[in-house]
Amino acid sequence: MKEIKNILIVSFGFLLLFTAFGGLQSLQSSLNSDEGLGVASLSVIYAALIVSSVFVPPIVIKKIGCKWTIVASMCCYITYSLGNFYASWYTLIPTSLILGFGGAPLWAAKCTYLTESGNRYAEKKGKLAKDIVNQYFGLFFLIFQSSGVWGNLISSLIFGQNYPAGSNDSFTDYSQCGANDCPGTNFGNGTGTTKPTKSLIYTLLGVYTGSGVLAVILIAVFLDTINLRTDQLKPGTKEESFSKKILATVRHLKDKRQCLLIPLTMYSGFEQGFLSGDYTKSYVTCSLGIHFVGYVMICFAATNAVCSLLFGQLSKYTGRICLFILAAVSNAACVIALLLWEPYPNDFAVFFIFPAIWGMADAIWQTQTNALYGVLFDEHKEAAFANYRLWESLGFVIAYGYSTFLCVSVKLYILLAVLLIAIVFYGFVEYLEHVEHKKAASTTISQNEDSNSLCKQTAM
């Protein structure tokens, strides 16, 4: 059917695009490590994404529609791949800004397209719109989530040609790897000093750029245009909702529960930023070589996807508090272990155990924090999730921003401190909810007693 065809086209378009971007993101701290250029570009991306989320999507979608917004935004992502061919401050930072400004319209247009398609199909078939939209999003994420596997697999297969079997054996000094890695120091004799050849880097970037171009062609040629309903296009409608959205996002901070959740939301950005920006460079690249970054991140992506599905179901039986505690304990244990561990190539399996545990914990942070926002702020979901995106993105910006100035050990202590603050503040939120539910229950019982008393008096 036409609707499913369009959903599949959008899904595979995003798969192709994020196969390229996801792979590049994992490699930035290792591939463009000079003066911290790689992580600086990632910080700029998320900073631009914050600004873009507030100002750009409604205007662009209104002007050119969902389909062509997706196409134009995908072209913004391709510029980042092109900028990596001649990586410098004059190429990567501008292309990072372009990507960041294109990111918010891309996701907004995708969500609008899938939602509108689901609503129209439900109307036509007389079904519940909510059920159809959920099915469409489920299909999309089923396909999209595998991009983390393919992008990293491609990079490891290509860069693996640069490292003959047994090439690690001649390196013995790894004292500067792991928590001991500091700005301005080299990796000693670790394998991280061996960079892939230019020809291999260009091959990888060529594959990634080609993947992005294929995504654009797929959407531009095969995706059907969907016209937004007339009431959505009336003059002033978007501008009004746009200004209201900004005010609602700011006003939502008056809710003390939202303020208490800021550290937890920012921690999501901190922990993801550490794994992709610091673990990949200071542990994996330094000790094993850049060709293993992809394999390690595949382990994270696969565990994350499986656990996201698992914990989404498990939360019905355990409740969210137990899962949050599990994630906090897992992350805290990993951070402490990373502070103490001296990474050597002989500890090969350990390099994969950390991202596997991290992926499990991240699955809890993502699924349960989103669910928590949905439950706590049921009547103000749009403002709540706007705050969620804002504070998580800010966490990314800070994590990538200080990456080039601090030792890994300091970054691990910061991560642990933010985690502890986040969990304590989250505990206050749960306490407030418990008190609120207790009051509501007492009020209900009191009303029932008054009602029974009134009935008895009437009977007399």
Swiss-Prot record:
What domain of life does the UniProt record list for this protein's source? Eukaryota
Q: Which CDD domains match?
A: MFS_unc93A_like
Its subcellular locations are: Membrane
Which Gene Ontology cellular component terms are annotated? membrane
Q: Glycosylation positions?
A: 168, 189
What is the residue range of the signal peptide feature?
Answer: none
Q: Where are the transmembrane segments?
A: 7-27, 41-61, 68-88, 89-109, 139-159, 203-223, 292-312, 321-341, 345-365, 390-410, 412-432
| Stored SUPFAM superfamilies | MFS general substrate transporter
Broad class of where this protein is predominantly found: membrane
Keywords attached to this Swiss-Prot or TrEMBL record, sorted alphabetically, are: Glycoprotein, Membrane, Transmembrane, Transmembrane helix
For this chain, the family text in UniProt reads: Belongs to the unc-93 family.
Name of the molecule in the record: Protein unc-93 homolog A
Origin species? Xenopus laevis (African clawed frog)
